[in-house]
């Protein structure tokens, strides 16, 4: 909690941030002020585009200067103004006294280096730890953030880890130097609910042990309620309300704060008709990845990412797939979509596709779409939003004129709640939540029959989550879409899924109608998942910890 009679560790005073492009200037942060005391957790909350991440990035001067500028303000850390600090002095602070966890792990991890090397570089640079000592410290950090069998992950590359595992590696890197201030920008966005709770507990323990302060940027008010000492509510670049968590949650003063507290996905999934045709079916699906060792790189074992799964999706039906990160849920979706090799039988709208090559799948791709977990990693930074969304139309609907394509793109953007005029802009100009909506628009513009939704709402604030759930329901009802909905957010799954598959270590733990499983889970593991999801507390049960 906040200490009294002491100076703030961080003091942001009258901070403004402006972006300049093509002669136009937009203000992203407008005269923001707040303090952060030693050992305190301050949450900066607001919807995507509110300016909270821009504020956080300003502290370490990570904005795209000179396109970005600060018309006003100071950022004092340990009495030093970060905005005027020389670059050499700033580098000494970055990654040492102040570390940062970003929202999208793939933007922070080097795809060419192993996990051991990336964590080891930090230990060598800041603590002069090398060799066996660095390896041991790396193993300790990976264990701390909940990565099972860390010895097997040391030589892994980022693309070989699940989204949640990548996020945990990034947290381990940030904690390696025991910083005074940790800036956490949606640090648990990609994590399943049980590990989310464990990571929050871990961060809380580290805060207590080392007197570490935290600036916690999030859209998840449930986390704020459990974890923060004070909260600052942002919208349109301004802080509109600040106070203790208890004050803001029990007696919100500003209309926008009341709007945030009231917004979350609600409602029931559309009715599923068992007489509707089967769109996608998988029987005994297996995806095994070989583990190689020795000079000859012989196969000594397998990671059984998916191990004998049966699944059926009908037109107008949503099957939710839930489980901890690394459980195999995304791998199952990729196998059904024929984006990775698998064993077992797969049929799509009556066609057996399990033996189809890449070329044979091409004519079906427009009807079989994917929305990925990490929007930044799936959107080309060199293409405008309009070009990104129109790309599939150029391949699959070549008869369309340029004007017809443009109309389809504009309609798709409107459907996901974005201004069609934004189609001339580029992905880096959007917030994380806006980028996710662009990814959804890109999939929907092709009018698919089957859509794999891999954490489609994970980067979205609560009110936009609710809008996207409503949008997905409307699109499903209109076009009889079959959704494979992969998520760790069981609140969203509850609002959207007709049927549920609970996965763990590549196998089905429990499956059936979603309403029945939510009301009366049969397996200990499912009970632990539900307890963590709806209470945001670390669940200490063998079902989760083993």
Swiss-Prot record:
Any one GO MF annotation of this record: ATP hydrolysis activity
Knockout or disruption consequences: The deletion mutant is hypersensitive to ampicillin, in a manner only partly dependent on the beta-lactamase AmpC. Deletion of the yejABEF operon leads to the accumulation of anhydromuramyl tri-, tetra- and pentapeptides in large quantities in the extracellular milieu. The yejABEF mutant displays cell swelling and lysis as well as a severe growth defect.
Subcellular location per the Swiss-Prot or TrEMBL entry: Cell inner membrane
Entry-linked PROSITE patterns: ABC_TRANSPORTER_1, ABC_TRANSPORTER_2
Positions annotated to bind ATP: 46-53, 323-330
EC number: 7.4.2.-
Translocase among keywords: yes
Domain of life the protein comes from: Bacteria
Family under the similarity heading: Belongs to the ABC transporter superfamily.
NCBIfam families: PRK10419.1, PRK11308.1
PANTHER family according to UniProt: D,D-DIPEPTIDE TRANSPORT ATP-BINDING PROTEIN DDPF-RELATED, TRANSPORT ATP-BINDING PROTEIN
Protein name: Peptidoglycan transport ATP-binding protein YejF
């Amino acid at each position: 909690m906040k200490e009294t009679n002491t100076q703030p560790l961080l003091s942001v005073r009258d901070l403004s941030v402006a972006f300049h492009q093509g002669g136009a200037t937009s203000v992203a942060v407008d005269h923001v002020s707040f303090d952060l005391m030693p050992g305190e957790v301050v949450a900066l909350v607001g919807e995507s585009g509110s300016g909270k991440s821009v504020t956080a990035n300003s502290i370490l001067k990570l904005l795209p200067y000179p396109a970005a500028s600060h018309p006003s303000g100071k950022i004092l850390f340990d009495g030093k103004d970060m905005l005027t600090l020389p670059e050499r002095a700033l580098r000494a602070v970055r990654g040492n006294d102040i570390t940062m966890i970003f929202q999208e792990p793939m933007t922070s991890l080097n795809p060419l280096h192993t996990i051991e090397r990336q964590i080891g570089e930090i230990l060598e640079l800041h603590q002069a730890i090398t060799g066996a000592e660095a390896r041991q410290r790396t193993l300790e950090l990976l264990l701390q953030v909940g990565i099972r069998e860390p010895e097997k992950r040391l030589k892994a590359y980022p693309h070989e880890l699940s989204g949640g595992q990548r996020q945990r590696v990034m947290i381990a890197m940030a904690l390696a130097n025991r910083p005074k201030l940790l800036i956490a920008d949606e640090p648990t966005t990609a994590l399943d609910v049980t590990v989310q709770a464990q990571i929050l507990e871990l961060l809380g323990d580290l805060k207590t042990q080392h007197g570490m302060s935290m600036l916690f940027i999030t859209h998840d008010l449930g986390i704020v309620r459990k974890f923060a000492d004070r909260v600052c509510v942002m919208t349109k670049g301004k802080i509109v309300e600040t106070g203790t968590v208890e004050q803001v949650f029990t007696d919100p003063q500003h209309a926008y704060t009341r709007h945030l507290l009231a917004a979350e996905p609600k409602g029931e999934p559309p009715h599923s008709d068992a007489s509707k045709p089967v769109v996608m079916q998988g029987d005994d699906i297996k995806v095994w990845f070989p583990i190689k060792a020795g000079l000859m790189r012989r196969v000594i074992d397998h990671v059984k990412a998916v191990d004998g799964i049966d699944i059926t999706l009908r037109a107008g039906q949503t099957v939710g797939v839930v489980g901890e990160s690394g459980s195999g849920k995304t791998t199952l979706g990729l196998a059904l979509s024929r984006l990775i090799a698998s064993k077992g039988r797969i049929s799509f709208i009556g066609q057996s596709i399990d033996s189809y090559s890449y070329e044979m799948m091409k004519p079906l791709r427009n009807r079989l779409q994917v929305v990925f977990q990490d929007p930044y990693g799936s959107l080309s930074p060199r293409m405008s939003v309009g070009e990104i969304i129109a790309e599939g139309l150029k391949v699959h609907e070549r008869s369309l004129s340029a004007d017809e394509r443009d109309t389809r793109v504009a309609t798709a953007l409107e459907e996901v709640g974005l201004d069609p005029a934004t189609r001339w802009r580029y992905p880096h100009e959007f917030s994380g939540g806006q980028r996710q909506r662009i990814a959804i628009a890109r999939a929907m513009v092709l009018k698919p029959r089957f859509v794999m939704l891999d954490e489609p709402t994970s980067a979205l604030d609560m009110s936009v989550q609710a809008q996207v759930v409503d949008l997905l329901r409307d699109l499903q009802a209109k076009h009889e879409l079959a959704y494979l909905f992969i998520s760790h957010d069981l609140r969203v799954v509850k609002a959207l899924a007709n049927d549920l598959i609970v996965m763990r270590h590549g196998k089905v733990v429990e499956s059936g109608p979603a309403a029945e499983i939510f009301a009366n889970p049969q397996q200990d593991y499912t009970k632990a998942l539900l307890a963590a999801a709806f209470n945001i507390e670390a669940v200490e049960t063998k079902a989760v910890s083993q």
